[in-house]
Swiss-Prot record:
Top-rank taxon, per record: Bacteria
Gene3D superfamilies: SpoA-like
The protein's name: Type III secretion protein HrcQb
Stretches for region Dimer-dimer interface: 78-81
Assembly description: Homotetramer. The four monomers assemble into two tightly bound homodimers. Interacts with HrcQa.
Chain segments carrying region Disordered: 1-57
Recorded name of the encoding gene: hrcQb
Residue ranges the record marks as coiled coil: none
Domain comment quoted from the record: The HrcQb-C domain interacts with the HrcQa C-terminal domain.
Start-end of Acidic residues biased regions: 1-21
Pfam families: FliMN_C (PF01052)
Protein's organism: Pseudomonas savastanoi pv. phaseolicola (Pseudomonas syringae pv. phaseolicola)
Length: 128
């Protein structure tokens, strides 16, 4: 089970959960919820929440950089040797996809970063 599956299960559980202590009871007389001091958000508390990173921000995720796929027969695989060039189809040179498990996170171009391989993001994949 991936971390994404666990997260999705947690979200579904939270969506199904209704806390009776957070239910608002409306007063017919003044049209406002009873049992609450104010309906206005506390600006100071909201600012503190923005300053603090979410609790899960330090969670490390294993991501995969994919630059193409190919299919070889077992015989072709056995014949591989140093210097063999394999043709990768379905992707342009320098293009790669950043994935978490099977979920695509972003796409980009492979770049040189001071002698090391890097990925310059060209498109983030939005979740719907």
């Amino acid at each position: 089970m991936s971390t994404e599956d666990l997260y999705q299960e947690d979200v579904e559980m939270l969506d199904d959960y209704e806390d009776p202590s957070t239910e608002q009871h409306w007063s017919e007389e003044d049209g406002e919820p009873s049992g609450y001091a104010t309906a206005e958000p506390d600006d100071h508390a909201a600012q503190e929440e923005q300053d603090e990173p979410p609790a899960l921000d330090s969670l490390a995720l294993d991501l995969t950089l994919r630059c193409g796929e190919l299919r070889l027969t077992l015989a072709e695989l056995r014949r591989l040797d140093a210097g063999t060039i394999l043709e990768v189809t379905g992707i342009s040179p320098g293009h790669a996809t950043l994935c978490h498990g099977e979920q695509v996170v972003a796409e980009g171009e492979l770049v040189d970063v001071e002698g090391r391989l890097g990925l310059q993001i060209t498109r983030l994949v939005t979740r719907s």
